[in-house]
């Protein structure tokens, strides 16, 4: 016969907290990083020919240099396209400016086509033109120190018709002279943009480099490498290497702590997380430290860490786990709603929502001994004794320490004289 027990299900938060969702410090690795290089070609008034002096400008020379780099290293660079946006300043007739802007578009595109041909580099050139660049005009005007700036801005807001705008602005004789020398020349232009990607190492290349010499990898590549395996030992090895190569980065320490929590190595987890916190006191680290505190039964300390993890993606789950520990079961179930974890199921059991608990347990991603144990509790509380014994047998087969807990758990009181139950817990 089993000795008189106590209702022990509520104390299981110490165990379920260990397989709650931890938070890893994510890598920022990108295989392809979007880049762009811009240049500007300026034109003389009413002209569309590209002057040699413009091709010698720093911006154009830098753009050509980037095109050469892309051509010479197509493993590291990948061109997307080239954009050409040509403009005419907003003086003169709309018809004339439309034709002028189009000619500027064509002349700048022709220059690029020649450069690409000489380099034997393929790229799409997307072109467009704006007949009268009123937006650019307004932007430059607002940033200027022109005396009549506010008056001209009011004219722009009062008149939508381009030709009427020009008439009104020309009436400001002194103001227009300043515009003609300071603003309008800047609008007679074509903007060239090379869009390309910086290409990083592939998954296979990162893994190969890790094996040959991990020190050659960036911290982002190392952290990313850990995501390429599901094996916990391999992850730990990569994170340990990362702490050696990049000791100032908190993420690898934090992630080692997260793995240690899942493995039930709380002292090891505490050590890693303490080191992580010394590098950066952030939500991810505090979330994991809260779970350790809950697993150790230190509710007050857990509450402190939870309060410092408000931006964590698992904040609601942390609050739910904390409320289970504090005995606020209805609030806990509400905070954990939708979380497919043992803690969520525990909260639902303690809030006596057995249907929800059963559904949650059937959807736990990495079901373990505690999942089976909680299934046994649900079955026992709903009068399904045979199912309770079956699930309890599965739980004890995975974690023999649950024998002692089951033997004293009054949720199984109706089984205390059941021979199958007695054989399981003896």
Where are these regions (language model features)?
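N-terminal targeting segments with Sec-dependent signals, encompassing both cleavable signal peptides
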Residues: 1-375, 379-394, 400, 404-408, ...
